[in-house]
């Protein structure tokens, strides 16, 4: 699934390599063909690393671990390896199948880093070299491939055999001068070694050698290595790494239909008093920078503000523009954001006044908060809503109204995020105007995602949503002008089986740093009767 590249920024100097492919992407496993494709699709990723091993009958396969179900791969015949299924259903690919796929994906902007595992004998070493070089030559991949290995003798043989294909050593126990004298083209060392020996980076560059650091999954380490001037960074987090190296802030937002507290006799054991503490626990555990709620009543608002004092809130009751009725509120971390604008409008023909819209069964509102990061000055225009559960015309017209409002907000490249209980699956045609305006669904367009139901009905499937495939997936995020990193439905246990009749959903994303916002006028931008 392609990464969501919604803002075109200036890329960092370092090339990002997806370690064993982007195996954290939806439906992927380490060294699989899905992970290879996901690495190519990941925003900012410039290369993919894979691991090659020989079977007992000299078939080259792409797999990291030597052991497979308790048996060494080099003691297994290929037909035994081929029977194995990964959790996503993929078989372990042959190097031939992997290279066929890589040939279609690799170009001047995306490179294959082909790790050859250490040989168990000199004879096997020769077989490795012959097969790997012949494989690259046959697929005309010499200009898009780099061989890497912990086996120094293997590196020497490769360098002598194919001087036109770069070779880098992984072992970390040789200086650049020593490797250069052996004809080896680069150092590909664990990041901790390069941080201990930063002089090796300069030495390698002076000798015309490349420098790659592996496996870097920490922002601070990545930024240190970037400042030291490494050429490549291998990581398990290629999309997140791009944001770190661009020095973009990463945010975590939650959308949550909290289930209003007004029906304790109907909710029984799931009534608000029995789950309110677990709602707070969920927020504390997940630590969002901001979260939008649906269905919140005043007593729930007061409870959350009391027990989550680190958050401030914007939003009004839908029935009078003050306290009455459900509130589509936005909570935000006071230490991270300031509010540049807050705005509530009604989903109706008269959006600036308290009103019903079209054939809706309830008044429906949208809360807008223009948030500015206090440190970076980046801005996010965040919209939160709850579409009607009955009125089909109301849902369709509400989306059109939202698109008009959000297109105005996004005109200057401002990142715009919409969350809410939409009472519709993404297959519903009501969302077509959002897609056409390039407000894209993060559930579908984020590399790390899921397709979990978001409506749980306290464990009972509701007849209202049971007729269509995916129809219980009704809580969504849409976005424009940002990089999406991860989407997740929070189905974990926070103290009771269900903290609401909906599961929260969470998205992580980055935005371009330094997008300035202007302070609003002091009067409220929320209009009411």
Please place each PLM-identified region on the residue numbering:
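Bacterial Sec-dependent N-terminal signal peptides
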Residues: 1-15, 524-529
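Acidic/histidine-rich helix-loop elements
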Residues: 21-24, 78-84, 255-277, 323, ...
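Structured beta-strand-rich core segments of catalytic domains in phosphoester-bond hydrolases
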Residues: 87-91, 290-379, 383
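Phosphate-group recognition and catalysis centered on beta-loop-alpha active-site segments
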Residues: 12-269, 282-286
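Active-site beta-strand/loop signature of hydrolases that rely on acidic residues for catalysis
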Residues: 252-258, 279-304, 331, 369, ...
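Active-site-proximal beta-strand elements of phosphoester/diester hydrolases
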Residues: 17-19, 250-265, 328, 340-345, ...
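Metal-dependent phosphoester-hydrolase catalytic domains
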Residues: 336, 393, 397, 404-416, ...
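N-terminal, active-site-proximal structural segment of metallo-dependent hydrolase catalytic domains
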Residues: 227, 246-307, 318-326, 512-523, ...
């Amino acid at each position: 699934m392609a990464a969501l590249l919604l803002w075109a920024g200036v890329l960092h100097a370092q090339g990002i390599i997806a370690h064993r492919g982007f195996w954290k992407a939806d439906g992927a496993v380490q060294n699989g063909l899905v992970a290879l494709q996901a690495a190519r699709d990941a925003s900012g990723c410039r290369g993919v690393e894979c691991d090659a091993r020989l079977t007992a009958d000299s078939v080259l396969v792409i797999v990291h671990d030597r052991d497979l179900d308790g048996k060494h791969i080099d003691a297994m015949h290929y037909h035994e390896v081929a029977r194995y299924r990964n959790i996503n259903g993929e078989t372990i690919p042959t190097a031939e199948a992997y290279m066929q796929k890589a040939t279609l994906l690799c170009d001047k902007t995306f490179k294959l880093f082909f790790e050859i595992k250490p040989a168990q004998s000199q004879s096997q070493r020769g077989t490795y070299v012959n097969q790997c070089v012949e494989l690259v030559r046959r697929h005309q991949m010499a200009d898009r491939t780099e061989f890497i290995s912990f086996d120094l003798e293997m590196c020497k043989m490769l360098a002598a055999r194919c001087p036109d294909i770069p070779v880098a050593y992984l072992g970390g126990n040789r200086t650049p001068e020593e490797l250069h004298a052996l004809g080896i083209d680069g150092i590909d060392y664990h990041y901790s070694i390069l941080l201990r020996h930063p002089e090796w980076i300069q030495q390698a560059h002076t000798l015309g050698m490349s420098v790659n650091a592996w496996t870097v999954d920490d922002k601070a380490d990545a930024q240190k290595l970037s400042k030291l001037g490494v050429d490549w960074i291998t990581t398990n987090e290629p999309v997140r790494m791009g944001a770190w190296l661009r020095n973009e802030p990463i945010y975590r937002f939650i959308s949550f239909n909290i289930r209003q507290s007004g029906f304790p006799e109907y909710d029984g054991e799931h009534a608000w008093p029995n789950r309110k503490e677990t709602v707070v626990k969920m927020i504390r555990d997940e630590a969002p920078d901001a979260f939008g709620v649906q269905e919140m009543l005043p007593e729930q608002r007061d409870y959350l503000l009391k027990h989550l004092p680190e958050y401030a809130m914007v939003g009004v009751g839908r029935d009078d523009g003050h306290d009455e009725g459900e509130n589509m509120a936005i909570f935000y971390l006071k230490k991270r954001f300031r509010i540049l604008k807050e705005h509530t409008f009604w989903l109706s023909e008269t959006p600036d006044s308290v009103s019903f819209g079209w054939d809706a069964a309830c008044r429906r509102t949208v809360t807008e908060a223009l948030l500015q990061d206090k440190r970076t000055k980046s801005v996010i225009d965040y919209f939160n809503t709850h579409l009607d559960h009955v009125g089909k015309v109301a849902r369709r017209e509400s989306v059109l109204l939202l698109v008009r409002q959000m297109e105005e907000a996004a005109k200057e490249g401002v990142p715009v995020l919409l969350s809410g209980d939409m009472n519709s699956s993404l297959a519903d045609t009501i969302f077509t105007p959002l897609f056409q305006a390039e407000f894209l669904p993060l559930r579908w367009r984020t590399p790390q995602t899921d397709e979990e139901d978001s409506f749980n009905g306290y464990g009972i499937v509701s007849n209202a949503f049971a007729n269509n495939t995916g129809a219980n997936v009704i809580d969504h995020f849409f976005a424009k002008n940002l990089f999406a990193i991860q989407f997740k439905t929070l189905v974990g246990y926070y103290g009771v089986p269900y903290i609401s009749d909906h599961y929260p959903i969470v998205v992580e994303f980055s935005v371009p740093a330094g997008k300035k916002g202007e302070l609003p006028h002091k009067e409220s931008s929320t209009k009411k009767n």
